[in-house]
From Swiss-Prot:
GO MF annotation: an example: rRNA (uridine-2'-O-)-methyltransferase activity
Taxonomic lineage: Archaea, Methanobacteriati, Methanobacteriota, Archaeoglobi, Archaeoglobales
Domain of life the protein comes from: Archaea
Record gene name: rlmE
Native species: Archaeoglobus fulgidus (strain ATCC 49558 / DSM 4304 / JCM 9628 / NBRC 100126 / VC-16)
The protein's name in its UniProt record: Ribosomal RNA large subunit methyltransferase E
Keywords tagged on the record: Cytoplasm, Methyltransferase, rRNA processing, S-adenosyl-L-methionine, Transferase
């Protein structure tokens, strides 16, 4: 159930964003300069489209991917597919072989069991990074959500060598009780 007292929920409704998550990307982009006008952005786990909407409004061309349907957005091409399957990567590459930014706010179905939810979030983040390694341009940027837990440092260490700048970040728009953090990787290098 949506928290009807949630400031960002109401702000998103008032300002026409598809979800409160739009403010997370806006805040991260303001801090880290992830998306520039003219960039080609790949949004994995995109539905309902808050991040795709922000990227398009920033002047990027966006390819959005999700297992669930998404209502159309201007300057956004949608692919319905599972990011863990190779055929989805093929569809992504049919549109473009390389992208300036790969981002993922994908979240697993929450079971209520912390360890399971954490591990599922790491699996989704790894699937996102697996795609990013294939399509992200050298010098490109990568953002992915993970839930904090015992595997987070191992995951960070896996990504670390691929980026000149890397850190975990929790935007102000994240709920205070949320265990989500975002890995920010800038200036990608293929190794």
């Amino acid at each position: 159930m949506k928290d009807r007292q949630d400031y960002y929920y109401w702000k998103a409704k008032k300002e026409g964003y598809r979800s409160r998550a739009a403010y997370k990307l806006l805040q991260m982009n303001r801090t880290f300069k992830l998306i520039r006008e003219g960039d080609l952005v790949l949004d994995l786990g995109a539905t309902p489209g808050g991040w795709s909407q922000v990227a398009a409004l920033l002047g990027a061309r966006v390819v959005a991917v999700d297992i669930n349907p998404m209502k159309p957005l201007e300057n956004v091409t949608f692919i319905r597919g599972d990011i863990t399957l190779p055929e989805t990567l093929e569809k992504i590459r049919e549109i473009s072989p390389d992208y300036d930014v790969v981002m993922s706010d994908a979240s697993p179905k929450i079971s209520g069991k912390w360890t399971i939810d954490h591990l599922r979030s790491i699996d989704l983040a790894r699937a996102s990074f697996s795609i990013a390694k294939e399509v992200l341009k050298p010098g490109g940027n990568f953002v992915v959500k993970v839930f904090q837990g015992e595997e987070i440092q191992k995951f960070f260490n896996e990504l670390k060598p691929h980026f000149r700048f890397k850190k975990f970040h929790s935007p102000q728009a994240s709920r205070k009780r949320s265990a989500e953090v975002y890995f920010i990787g800038k200036r990608f290098r293929k190794i």
